[in-house]
Structure formats: structure tokens, C-alpha cells
Amino acid sequence: MARKTPIERYRNIGIMAHIDAGKTTATERILFYTGISHKIGETHEGAAVMDWMSQEQERGITITSAATTAFWQGMDQQYPQHRINIIDTPGHVDFTIEVERSLRVLDGAIAVFCAVGGVEPQSETVWRQATKYEVPRMAFVNKMDRAGANFGRVVEQIRTRLKATPVPLQLPIGAEDEFKGVVDLVRMKAIYWNEEDMGVTYEQTDVPAELADEAAEAREFLVEAAAEADEELMDKYLEGGELTVEEINRGLRARTLANEIVPAFCGSAFKNKGVQALLDGVIEYLPSPVDVPAIEGELDDADGTVATRKPGDDQPFAALAFKIATDPYVGTLTFFRVYSGVVQTGDTVFNPVKGKKERLGRIVQMHANSREEIKEVRAGDIAAAVGLKDVTTGDTLCDINNKITLERMEFPDPVISVAVEPKTKGDQEKMGMALGKLAQEDPSFQVRTDEESGQTIISGMGELHLDIIVDRLKREFKVEANVGAPQVAYRETIRKTVEQEGKFVRQSGGRGQYGHVHLRISPQERNAGYEFVNSIVGGVVPKEYIPSVDKGAYEALENGILAGFPAIDVKVELYDGSYHDVDSSEAAFKIAGSMAMKEGFMKADPVLLEPIMRVEVVTPEEYMGDVMGDLNRRRGTVQGMEDGPSGKIIRAQVPLKEMFGYATDLRSATQGRASYVMFFDEYQEAPASIADEIIKKAS
């Protein structure tokens, strides 16, 4: 089969936003105008095509990023047909993992902002993640029909809060209930979408007289931004020459792809205005797979040589699995992005992370929640494979003869844990299987069994995250569970350097055991992790035993020494020791390493660390005193305040331990008018009173 759409006409994009910016509605409209979805689903009624998990329909927030394929030729059919793959990303902070994961596989993104709420704290989080992955972006200021809508103010916030350079390509004609259409600043025309056919067709007129001055000024800014793309355009601009529409678009595209500017559009998805022009912008300014740097990976050799895979059909096949979903009809769906090469159904590919082969039995392309079986996928495509055996999020799928591991995604460690037990004994096994499936779908969710109590402990990124997991147990797997009180994920570390001997000797007839080491144990900077250094000279500890010493020390730290929590940021140096020709073994040195670690750790001024969360509360001014007082009572430190569109924004650092049940307390303190977001910030030393209590409990 030949390629239907040239790869230059692909756009793999994500739509990212704060919870209520109207992202799902915008995505719905995109699907409507691109002719796949003939009935526009409204989030308010809980029926949007993209929101296909039933919980999302109840909560009205988007949890799983579904991937959808759509086609677009422009409002005037002015382009050849382009293929747009849309990855829907959740806006809720407990799901930033989903956002990271989708940003990893997209080439460009649309950031949706509410014209009233502007840049909310959550938008900043997502924006930072997009910057980390160098994703070119456009902005869509939505909800222009709402009371208090102000396009200029939101553009200014993008500049000041997100430290970006927005370039408005449109101006709104009217606002709030007078919002009628937009001025297209590139072509200097006014566009009014027809309400009879839900905005499929539109009228084009001259710019309204009352907006002429403002439009001329805005266009000057836009043309200058385009001219800065290259010397040829700049020279023409400085010599007073008019840039053509083509030249302006060429300049804007180059600067958007270089992450220098953010083209800004406006509209009201709900009122069917502006999304059509936004789609033209996707084609005009966002990258195709060919416009972004070739993906890098490690080859299957001893050195892990770094190689690239270019986005071409003639390259060896390489793809990244970015989401696992359990589908009630077909079982496990593995969503993957193809970076290079071609693969057909029935082909066998290799997963280098697991070291296993996988056969691609069926490949489907998803449209939100309906699916189409396809025979092959090519570079640039996003599709889902049915029933792969052992592939987790972040794994690579590649050609068996050209093995490569694309960079792993990094997932944060969970910060909150709860014990769960099934309400009926008979559900124990069912619950175990269900939790295993959910953990495979979501790497930021972990399951383990507590060795002492035998309880099943689940851990995640926040209370909402775990609520949804428990909810899914009930809904998808029919397991009713009781949930214990939330537990905080503490860590341990040390404050000073010590030297410690560890000696494990057993001599009792026959072969004995002999392992003897000297370790230098020292603290590392926060987030530096565990480091093992071998400084043995002259073979006093033979080479083959050194990994065992490392393993013994590391496992002792992993299991916790002070109070049973994993110890972090510790450097271990093996600098001396001795061995016995007959009695020494790997096991003996592992025990010696572990003994030295446990003893040395307790002498190295050990401390307990607690997770500190970044909390951002948006509250009406009259409740500000109460909210701040409450944060102080929770051992919080307020770091700053500013005026937001819907009240004061208070930024604080608060220990996670003090934040349980905060949502309910905040609601009652402010009569439901305040909202907050919270995400993990860093580990800090826990105060002695709290540490002592926890250590006492552990012993």
C-alpha cells in the first residue's frame, strides 16, 4: 500500500488546558468541522466524544488522553488534505503524568485559555512541561462569549506569567454576548461564522471601522514578528516593502517552529466561532513530523551508542508506546506513535526494554471511542495495537534487526498511599488482577503488598488520582473496596559522612562464609540519588564481589533504616576490605555491605524527609485572611500572592501530611467559592516532633 497522505501534511498535535478552559468542547468542534463527528457533544451534558470513560462524564474532567484522527483542507478548501492526529490531554494536576506522556509523542500543541479566567496556575504547570519537551505551541483564547471575557488581558498574561511571546493573529469583534466574529490580521478581513449551519460557512467583509486603528497596530506587530524570521524578510520589511500573506505566514511558521513565538487566536468553541480558523492555523504554523528533530535512542550495543531515527518510510521501524488502555470489547489497547519506518498487521516487532518479541495481530486507529481496523501504519502515524502481551507505557517497539531503545519517559514517584481491601474475601484475587491492569496503564500508580500487615497498598499522585482508581475498581472490575486513611510517602537520608566496617564471618565446619568491607557513606545533594563508587586498589576485595556489595548497600537503603522508608541521596564508597580464598562468596559480601550500611547510616545523623507540596489557592478577597490562616496552621509557608481574574491567588508550600481533606475544609471555609491545585514540589526535613512520632511507630 502506498502512503495516502504525504508525511509533510501530517500534524500530530495535543490540546492542553486548565480544567475549565473549554478544551473538550474545542476538541469536539474540531471533530465536527473535520467531518468525522456529525453531532456536537457537549461536556455540560456529559456526552463529549473525547470523554469516553464514564467517570469523566460524571466529573466533567478529561482523564485519559484518547487519540483521534481527523482530516482538514481549510475553511476555503485552500489546502491539500491534511491529516491531523489529536491527542487529548487531561488538565487536572493529578494527571500531569498523562500530560507528560502525550507531550512526549506530539509535534505541536494548542494551549486553550479561558477568556475570563486567563492563565490559571494549572496552565503554568502544563506550559512548563511543554517547554521541557520543546513543543511548538499556538494559543486559543476560548469562551469569548462569556461575561468578563477579555482577549487582550489573556495575551498579556501569556507574556507575563508564562514568559512566552504571544503574537495575536486575530482580534475579537465584540465580546461577551456581543461577540460576533474575528478580524483576521494576516489578511486584514473580518470573519463572521453563520449560525444556521453551526459555523460551517462564514461571511467575509472589510474590517469594521471602529476596529481599524487597533487592527492596523496589531498587524504591524505581527508583520514585524514574521519579518524577524530571516534576513531576506527583514530587509524587505525595513525597506518599507509590504510583505505578502505567503511571506508573513512563512515567517510566522519558522518562528513558531523555533519556539520563539506563540500565535494567538480567539473564539468561542461553544458558539461555533473561531475553531475553523484555528484548524487553518494548525496547518499553517504547527510542525509536521519532518519539521521536528529526529528522535534519538540507544542502540543495542555494549556502549549504548546514541542514534537517530528520521521520520521516513524507508527507515527501520521504531515506535513508542505512550498509553495503555483497557477496552471493554477488545481487551488491552496499546497506543503508539510511529517515528520511522512502516509496520503491517501480522508483523513481529521487538520490545528492547523488556527484551521480548511482540506480534502485532490487529492495529486500530481510534476516533475518540469508535475504531477503524487498519492494515499498516507508517512514520508519523498514531495508532493502537490490540492485545500486546508485555508492553508498558514508555516502552519502544522496533524492527527486530535494527534494535533501538527510544528515550524512556521519566515518571514521578507517587507521594500518597492508601491501604485497600476488598469488601468480600472472594474478591481478593479479582482485586489483585484489576490493580495490576491499572498499574500497567498508569506508571505513576503503584501497587505493593505490605510485608508486615499483608495489606495491599496503592500509591499515586494525589487524592483525586487514588479516588479515581478506587472508582474504576468498582465500575470496570466490579470490585467493591474499603479504603484506609491516606499515608504519606516519607523518605530518609543522612547529614554527615561516616566510615563504617561491615564484617560477615561464619566458620562452622565445612565451607564457611566470609565478607569484609569498609564503606564511606556520605550525603548527596537533594535529587542526586544513590551513587556507588568503587575505590578498591590492589584487589583486596576481588572484582566479582563488588556488585554484591553495591547491591547489599542499595537494598538496605531501599528498605529504609531509620523508620522503614526508602533512603535517598546517599553516596557509598567501597574503599577497603578483605576476603578469604575459600569462604568468600557473593552472598557473604552482599550481607557485609548491608550490615555496614545499616550501622553506618544510623551514625551519619539520619533524618526523615517529608514531601512538600506546592499549593495554589484562588479565593475571593473576603476569604483571604481565613485561607492564609488555615495554610499557616497546616505548617505552610506562603510564598506570594497576586491578583487573579477570579480572586486572589495565594501560592504556598505545605507538607502533604497536613493537606489531607483540604478540599472539604476549603469548600466550607469559603462557601465553595475558592479552588486550589496542588502538586509535589520537593522533600524537606520533617520537624523533630513529627519525625520522632513516625520513627516510634515504625519501631
From Swiss-Prot:
Per the record, the similarity remark reads: Belongs to the TRAFAC class translation factor GTPase superfamily. Classic translation factor GTPase family. EF-G/EF-2 subfamily.
Q: Name one GO cellular component term.
A: cytoplasm
Q: What is this protein called?
A: Elongation factor G
Where in the numbering of this chain does the tr-type G domain appear?
Answer: 8-290
Keyword annotations: Cytoplasm, Elongation factor, GTP-binding, Nucleotide-binding, Protein biosynthesis
Keyword rRNA-binding listed? The answer is no
Where GTP is bound, by residue?
17-24, 88-92, 142-145
Where it mainly occurs, coarsely classed, is cytoplasm
Q: Which HAMAP family match?
A: EF_G_EF_2_B (MF_00054_B)
Answer whether the UniProt record assigns the keyword GTP-binding to this protein: yes
Q: Which PROSITE patterns match?
A: G_TR_1, G_TR_2
Q: Which InterPro entries match?
A: EFG_II, EFG_III, EFG_III/V, EFG_IV, EFG_V, EFG_V-like, EFTu-like_2, G_TR_CS
Q: What does this protein do?
A: Catalyzes the GTP-dependent ribosomal translocation step during translation elongation. During this step, the ribosome changes from the pre-translocational (PRE) to the post-translocational (POST) state as the newly formed A-site-bound peptidyl-tRNA and P-site-bound deacylated tRNA move to the P and E sites, respectively. Catalyzes the coordinated movement of the two tRNA molecules, the mRNA and conformational changes in the ribosome.
According to the UniProt entry, its GO molecular function terms are:
GTP binding; GTPase activity; guanosine tetraphosphate binding; translation elongation factor activity
Please tell me the species this chain comes from: Alkalilimnicola ehrlichii (strain ATCC BAA-1101 / DSM 17681 / MLHE-1)
Q: Which GO terms describe its biological process?
A: ribosome disassembly
Which segments cross the bilayer? none
| Compartments reported by the entry | Cytoplasm
